[in-house]
């Protein structure tokens, strides 16, 4: 269900020739048909969320095709022209290097980088926002970047919730409870849901849910009897907060609305929204 202000609406793309129009319409249809409530104050916020999701998906595919390597933190490496490898295996932005250039280099020269899956997901989030922000804004927000697992910049606002409906552009986690300790890095897989039943995970590539579970199951202890599984934990960029920094020059998606109800009372507690 999609709510704009106090109105429950069914949105649709009005310009079928705009970039990724079909993908955007699919996302809107999924959100409108889900039981979960997606609440926005304005249509511009919905447009930002929609474009953010598309950019997360395209950034995930770009990273997949970049040659970016899968490595444990003990074996991680980065381009020393832009980053310093920390003692824990993270990547620390060098002084006087704009974060926008350093993030773009990961996608341009992926073979010069290697790390594990959680860091890869955060890199994808930064790249998606870079596509929607002025470079000056991005550099101001994310100065002194450190890329290391979930230690992301305080100005990157994320929402993690349990339960809810899966939407393309969501980050979801596969858990492998009986992983072989010799390959503990396969205790789970962070992935971006690409839509059409496909996920991207750094290390497994672009695969279906069943294929990712199979890959994780291959890395269990001998005689394991518990299968890997897709958890119900979903992580998203808080598009309502992050939309404040969007570039005025970023093209807006033209969205029309079929009104369903215009007197909804919306209440949000934590990350749960209810409509009365």
Curated annotation (Swiss-Prot):
Gene Ontology molecular functions: protein-glutamine gamma-glutamyltransferase activity
Coiled coil: none
Broad enzyme group: transferase
Top-level taxonomic group: Bacteria
Signal peptide coordinates: none
Pfam families: TGL
Its EC number(s): 2.3.2.13
Catalytic activity: L-glutaminyl-[protein] + L-lysyl-[protein] = [protein]-L-lysyl-N(6)-5-L-glutamyl-[protein] + NH4(+)
Protein's UniProt keywords contain Cell cycle: no
Job of this protein: Probably plays a role in the assembly of the spore coat proteins by catalyzing epsilon-(gamma-glutamyl)lysine cross-links.
Protein name, entry field: Protein-glutamine gamma-glutamyltransferase
Organism (species): Bacillus anthracis
Lineage, uppermost ranks: Bacteria, Bacillati, Bacillota, Bacilli, Bacillales
Gene that encodes it: tgl
């Amino acid at each position: 269900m999609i709510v704009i202000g106090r109105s429950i609406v069914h949105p649709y793309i009005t310009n079928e020739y705009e970039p990724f129009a079909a993908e955007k319409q699919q996302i809107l249809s999924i959100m409108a048909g889900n039981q979960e409530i997606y609440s926005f104050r304005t249509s511009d916020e919905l447009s930002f969320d929609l474009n953010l999701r598309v950019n997360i998906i395209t950034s995930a595919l770009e990273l997949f095709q970049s040659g970016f390597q899968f490595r444990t933190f003990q074996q991680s490496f980065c381009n020393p022209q832009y980053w310093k490898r920390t003692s824990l295996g993270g990547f620390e932005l060098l002084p006087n290097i704009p974060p926008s250039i350093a993030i773009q280099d990961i996608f341009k020269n992926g073979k010069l980088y290697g790390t594990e899956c959680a860091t890869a997901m955060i890199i994808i989030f930064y790249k998606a926002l870079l596509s929607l922000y002025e470079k000056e804004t991005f550099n101001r927000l994310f100065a002194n970047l450190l890329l290391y697992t979930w230690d992301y910049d305080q100005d990157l606002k994320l929402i993690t919730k349990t339960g809810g409906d899966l939407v393309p552009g969501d980050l979801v986690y596969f858990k492998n409870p009986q992983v072989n300790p010799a390959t503990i890095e396969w205790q789970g897989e962070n992935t971006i849901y690409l839509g059409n039943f496909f996920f991207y995970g750094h290390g497994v590539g672009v695969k279906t849910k069943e294929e990712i579970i199979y890959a994780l199951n291959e890395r269990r202890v001998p005689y394991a009897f518990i299968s890997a599984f897709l958890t119900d934990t979903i992580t998203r960029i808080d598009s309502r907060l992050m939309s404040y920094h969007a570039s005025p020059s970023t093209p807006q998606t033209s969205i029309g609305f079929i009104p369903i109800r215009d007197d909804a009372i919306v209440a949000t507690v934590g990350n749960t929204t209810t409509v009365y």
